[in-house]
Structures are given as C-alpha cells and as structure tokens.
Amino acid sequence: MESRCAKAASVVGDTKSLPSLHAKVAEGESIKVVAFGSSSTEGTGQLPKSEIFASVLGRELSKELLTPVELINKGKGGDTIPKMVARLERDVLAQKPDLVVWQLGVNDVLQMEGVEGAISQMKAAIETLRAHGLPVVLVDLQVAPMVDRDKDTPVMQAAIEKEGARPGILHFHRQALMRRMIESGETTMDDLVLKDGLHMSRLGHLCTGQLLAQQIAKSSLEVKVSTR
C-alpha cells in the first residue's frame, strides 16, 4: 500500500460483520461488486480508467480476499442522488451483486439549494437495497475547494454518517481520509485534487481504492458473534 495512504488508514471508518460476503469468501467463491456513483466512480477522462478508485478497489479487494472479484462500474458523471435512484433497478439490482459500493452526495450539494429531498431518496434507496439482502458501502464526499465551501456539505455528510451507522452498512470516510492526509503534512490539496478544484487526483483515487478494499475485506472476514 502507498505509505501516504496507510498513514491515514485509522480515519476511514469501522468494519462490521457482513455475513453474506463472509459466506462467499469462506467458500472461495467469486464476488460481484457494483460501484455505483457519479464522476468519482466513472472517471473524468483526466485519468486512465485503471487508476479510478473503483478499478483500484476491484484489484485490491481480490488480493485482500484471495478470491476473484468482478467489479461492475456504474458511475455516471454529474449524477445526483435522485438521478442515481432512477437507475437503481437497471444498474444495481439487475446486476445481482454481492455488494454495492455507493459513492454519493457531491453533485446534490453542488447543484441543489438544500439537500433534504436527496437525503430522503437516499434513505429510501438504502431500504430497497437492504430489502434485497445487499450489504452497502457508502462513500462520502471528497475534500475539494468547490465542495468545502458549500453550505450543504455538512448536512449531506451528517446524513451519510447516520445511515452508515446502521447494521449491514459500511461508511467509508473519504472526506476524513483526505483531510487527515492534508493536515498531517503528508500531502497538499493540490496532491489530492485536480486543477478543476473538484475531482480527485491519481493519489486520491489510489488511497480511496486501497483503503476501501481493506475496510471491505476486514468486514467480509469478520464473524458475527451472537450474544444470549
């Protein structure tokens, strides 16, 4: 793992038991992951597809779990939560994945005046995914000048954090990761964000993909202990 990524690993979020994934890993079965999101997931053309965090995640998760991982990239640049929810059936449920990684929220913050409606749709979509027995990883907003100065950013972040605290849902703290890397002096904003002031650089994608794979792998290997 890239050393600058590893030094910020403590802030990316907790692990949780994911029984359905644990069973597949224990049997050595392949795992199908849908990466669902906007341009952070799809890529922007400024970086090769192989360097986008979703691609890094697929490679690294296979190494971590020692089992094949099929990564289906369903990112679409510019999408808000309502637009993603509109394609949830086609792009997620119809793929019959074992895990959904949902990167979300940034376009709602940047394009909307108030994000309460988007948050309500996020909650409903998560309920739909849970009803299908799918574990979900929520990837929150990035650190970037355009994002940091928007008044709706803290509102969206808080909503994602609240949903990510529920059973069967992981929260990958991308914003905390990037902020820790900058505040520690390991990197600068310019190292992690492209010149457009919004999208992640190669290093931002690399750290997100590597540490996300580690979080998912640890959760997949956890065994839920029942208490009586």
Task: Label every PLM stretch briefly.
Residues 1-3:
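N-terminal secretory targeting signals
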Residues 5, 227-228:
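Compositionally biased, proline/threonine/alanine/serine-rich low-complexity intrinsically disordered stretches
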Residues 5-77, 87-96:
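Serine-esterase "nucleophile elbow" of acetyl-processing enzymes
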Residues 56-67, 80-227:
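Alpha-helical cap/lid subdomain in secreted, periplasmic
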